[in-house]
Amino acid sequence: MTLLDGITSRLVDTDRLTVGILERVGDNPATAPEQTVVLIHGNVSSSLFWQELMQDLPSDLRVIAIDLRGFGETESLSVDATRGVRDFSDDVHATLTALGIETAHLVGW
């Protein structure tokens, strides 16, 4: 995986699954959670889609791009079709909880 300057990749263990994320820390590594932007990719994509935007956002923001279940570096677990997209939203919530982020701005497509 090729990452653009300033972007790092890591795995986050949650109580649901192991999630791959890309991260660009703000100017201050202790950036407050409310200064966090979380990017969520669309179908047949991954967090890699967001790299250019991650570099372009203001440098005072912490930016995280999450790989949804079965995409990118995130564990491939089955999705319960009776729950609609709730498996995905629960995975995102579990990831933010594992990262200690209680408040964030969500962006997706």
Identify what each model region corresponds to.
Residues L22-N28, A65-W109:
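Active-site loop/oxyanion-hole signature of alpha/beta-hydrolase fold enzymes
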Residues G42-E52, V63:
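Serine-hydrolase catalytic-loop signature spanning alpha/beta hydrolases and amidase-signature enzymes
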Residues V38-G42, W109:
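The conserved beta1-alpha1 loop
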Residues T14, G42, L68:
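Active-site donor-binding loop signature of nucleotide-sugar glycosyltransferases
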Residues M1-V37, P58-L61, D87, I101-T103:
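Alpha/beta-hydrolase fold catalytic core
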Residues T36, F49-W50, T74-E75:
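Short glycine-/acidic-enriched loop or helix-start segments at secondary-structure transitions
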Residues I7, F49-E52, D56, D87-A94:
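Alpha-helical elements of Rossmann-like donor-binding domains used by nucleotide-donor carbohydrate transfer enzymes
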